């Protein structure tokens, strides 16, 4: 973590339709080039379209949604995939699954969030659940992006990312 290049961060959840999409878009929005965020899932949505409510709250927050899609985490284990510096699971199911081998053995962390797509109720209630998840993710990412990443070793990056799970 000692050069000036941006760090690649991969966010994982089961379907890559809500939480990991929110995290990818938010980190790319707030990082000012310090990070390049990606997202994927173990069982992505077949139509490759993120949850419409996830896209709606991102747009409402002024975060770009261009290029967001649900995709398999397998594409990030391929030899020509971007090298990841950090892989973060954002749902408990993905955290418990056997992940692919990530080239370069990136640092890992788990930041669990409740699945907003499982909230029952009116569209307004569901949309509020997505907004609250976005707020939680952004709060943690604001702390993450303020870390002195250039001076962190891989182990220190991993420890710092894991400590943020408690925030």
Task: Describe the predicted segments one by one.
Residues 2-78:
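Conserved active-site segments centered on acidic
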Residues 17, 92-95:
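Short glycine-rich anion-binding loops that position phosphate/pyrophosphate groups of nucleotides
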Residues 47-48, 95-97:
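Short, charged/polar "capping" segments at the starts of alpha-helices
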Residues 82-83:
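Alpha-helix C-terminal capping/helix-to-coil transition sites in glycosyltransferase folds
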Residues 86:
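Short, Asp-centered acidic motifs that coordinate Mg2+ and/or phosphate
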Residues 89-90, 110:
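Redox-cofactor binding/interface segments in oxidoreductases and associated redox assembly factors
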Residues 98-167:
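Phosphate-binding/catalytic loops
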């Amino acid at each position: 973590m000692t050069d000036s290049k941006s760090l690649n961060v991969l966010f994982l959840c089961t379907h890559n339709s809500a939480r990991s999409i929110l995290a990818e878009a938010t980190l790319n929005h707030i990082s000012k080039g310090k990070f390049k965020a990606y997202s994927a899932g173990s069982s992505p949505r077949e139509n490759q379209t993120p949850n419409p409510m996830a896209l709606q709250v991102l747009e409402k927050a002024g975060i770009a949604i261009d290029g967001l899609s649900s995709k398999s985490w397998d594409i990030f284990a391929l030899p020509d995939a971007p090298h990841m510096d950090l892989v973060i699971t954002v749902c408990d199911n993905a955290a418990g699954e056997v992940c692919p081998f990530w080239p370069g053995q990136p640092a890992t962390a788990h930041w669990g969030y409740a699945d907003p797509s499982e909230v029952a109720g009116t569209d307004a209630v569901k949309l509020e659940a997505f907004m609250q998840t976005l707020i939680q993710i952004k709060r943690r990412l604001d702390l993450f992006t303020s870390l002195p990443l250039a001076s962190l070793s891989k182990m220190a990056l991993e420890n710092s990312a894991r400590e943020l799970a408690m925030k």
